[in-house]
Amino acid sequence: ASAYGAGSFEIAKTLEDHRVDYLAVAVADEGADLRKAGINSSIIIMNPEITAFKTMFDYRLEPEVYSFHLLEELIKAAEREGVSNFPIHIKIDTGMHRLGFAPSEIPQLVQRLQKQSADITRSVFSRLVGSDAERFDAFTRHQIETFEAASTTLQEGFKHKIIRHICNTAGIERYPGAQFDMVRLGIGLYGVDPFTNKMLHNVTTLKTTILQIHEVPADETVGYSRKGVLTRDSRIAAIPI
């Protein structure tokens, strides 16, 4: 939300100036705000709400689609509005087990997509579970292989090119062979490196002011529910964030 606090418009404008392929935001309202602020880049909505389909149509916001229920609702909404070939992004669940079509559902999904003209698949993607940890390497490779097979099945059902992407910040660095057509750089955009090899450099600074300083003796508590117990005499500063 709000580009990790760095400012949605400011980050979006910078990325747009550098000609990124896509921006991604959580909900449709965020995307609409970027459009109103003058951002013209393609925008993916990662958590699309059924009640926000009209907003997506009006502001050219492209939803992630992760279930048959969501797909059917989107098709119906598009047909009501007279919308055709509306760009969507298919999510495949390769192991995160939060949202996404099961790989076994892809043949059925292809058949359903072929029978309608309201939506057109722009990309297919998945999320890596533990690409930042060596202990999960075997599972990460399994996810990549599963995604490659499922996305190939999806692509074979259509003549137009469907963009594929699975790598997050850690995946970009550790699995260059899995970068496919596009990657999703998240926290790494701000220089936060999931490893200690210093390939990324921190580009942000958080500054604030001190509102008040208290001299508090040992054995007193700080904060709600008295959870912060002081083991020594302390100087406590309150700061606004």
Predicted regions: what they are:
Residues A1-H165, Q179:
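Active-site-proximal beta-alpha core segment in soluble small-molecule metabolic enzymes
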Residues F86, R235-A237:
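Short beta-strand micro-motifs in enzyme catalytic cores
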Residues D137-R235:
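Anionic-ligand-binding alpha/beta catalytic cores of soluble enzymes and soluble regulatory domains
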Residues I239-I241:
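A structural micro-motif recognizing beta-strand termini
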